[in-house]
């Protein structure tokens, strides 16, 4: 939790309150910040604090480690292709039970415990997300976002609730799909014209040298990000995250951020300080 001194400092900065009052921020939550209880507590307290000072946060989550744990308990061997979980029907059943029934409700309870008001959802609720199959049929029930309906989200955030969304949705026939949580967050941010899309990761951000954290690129445009991808400065698992940011920016999101979720209070440091701590992408 923030100290009283830190809270007073933020709350006394009228420019911050004016700048962000009623603005929507969509946060994709994953990585070490989900596995480490101390980091988890900090993320939750940051969310609640941001809602207290007038922002309207929305949390989107996956839950890979928890899924793997329960697959192991049920003697189901996880399979991956190029880092993407191959999702047959038994795996899809576990994914949905774990993300919607366990991880999501644990996050909701944690937010409520720290003084916020939260509602847990999946993409199925209120037709929030309509899915379609991935263009890679060998991945099984891995889906893409076909449509986003934000009516339910708008009702919730306009009444000071913090929506927590599991990245599971269904197609028009009712078949469940496992969708990348970055993608879900980006599409929701775009549809809501969010002020910020924030991806919490296990890296400092976009680095010129992947092995040197001091080479962090703190600010870049869409074109600069594309150029860095062409020259392989942006590579591997960072490519889909950057592409997600680019898509959301192209659809009206004001800024997209890739942060190190292993840093205490990473959200507040990025949003409420001039220098930030991660990589910010803008149009």
From Swiss-Prot:
Record flagged with keyword Kinase: yes
Entry-linked InterPro entries: AceGlu_kinase-like_sf, AcgluKinase_fam, ArgB, Asp/Glu/Uridylate_kinase, Glu/AcGlu_kinase, NAGK-C
Catalytic activity: N-acetyl-L-glutamate + ATP = N-acetyl-L-glutamyl 5-phosphate + ADP
Entry's Gene Ontology molecular function annotations: acetylglutamate kinase activity; ATP binding
Enzyme class: transferase
Keyword DNA damage included in the entry's annotation: no
Keywords: Amino-acid biosynthesis, Arginine biosynthesis, ATP-binding, Chloroplast, Kinase, Nucleotide-binding, Plastid, Transferase
Superkingdom as given in the UniProt entry: Eukaryota
GO biological process, one term: L-arginine biosynthetic process
SUPFAM superfamilies linked: Carbamate kinase-like
Gene3D superfamilies: Acetylglutamate kinase-like
Pathway membership, UniProt: Amino-acid biosynthesis; L-arginine biosynthesis; N(2)-acetyl-L-ornithine from L-glutamate: step 2/4
Example of a GO cellular component annotation carried by this entry: chloroplast
Residues under site feature: Transition state stabilizer: 28, 241
EC number: 2.7.2.8
Binding site for substrate: 63-64, 85, 178
Assigned protein family: Belongs to the acetylglutamate kinase family. ArgB subfamily.
Function per UniProt: Catalyzes the ATP-dependent phosphorylation of N-acetyl-L-glutamate.
Full protein name: Acetylglutamate kinase
């Amino acid at each position: 939790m923030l100290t009283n001194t830190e809270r007073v400092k933020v709350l006394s900065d009228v420019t911050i309150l004016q700048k962000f009052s009623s603005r929507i921020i969509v946060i994709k939550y994953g990585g070490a910040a989900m596995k480490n209880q101390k980091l988890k507590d900090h993320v939750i307290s940051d969310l609640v604090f941001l809602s207290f000072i007038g922002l309207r946060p929305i949390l989107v989550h996956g839950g890979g480690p928890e899924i793997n744990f329960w697959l192991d308990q049920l003697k189901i061997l996880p399979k991956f292709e190029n880092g993407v979980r191959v999702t047959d029907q038994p795996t899809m059943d576990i994914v949905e039970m774990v993300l919607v029934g366990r991880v999501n409700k644990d996050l909701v309870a944690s937010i409520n415990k720290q003084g916020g008001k939260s509602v847990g959802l999946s993409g199925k609720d209120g037709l929030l997300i309509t899915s379609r199959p991935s263009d890679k049929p060998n991945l099984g029930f891995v889906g893409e976002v076909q449509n986003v309906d934000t009516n339910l989200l708008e009702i919730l955030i306009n009444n000071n609730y913090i929506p927590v969304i599991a990245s599971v949705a269904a197609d028009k026939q009712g078949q469940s799909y496992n969708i990348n949580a970055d993608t879900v967050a980006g599409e929701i941010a775009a549809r809501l014209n969010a002020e910020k899309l924030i991806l919490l990761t296990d890296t400092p951000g976009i680095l010129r040298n992947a092995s040197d954290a001091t080479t962090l690129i703190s600010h870049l445009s869409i074109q600069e990000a594309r150029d860095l991808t062409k020259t392989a400065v942006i590579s591997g698992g960072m490519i889909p995250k950057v592409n997600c940011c680019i898509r959301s920016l192209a659809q009206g999101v004001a800024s997209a951020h890739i942060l190190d979720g292993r840093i205490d209070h990473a959200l507040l440091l990025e949003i409420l300080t001039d220098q930030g701590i991660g990589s910010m992408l803008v149009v």
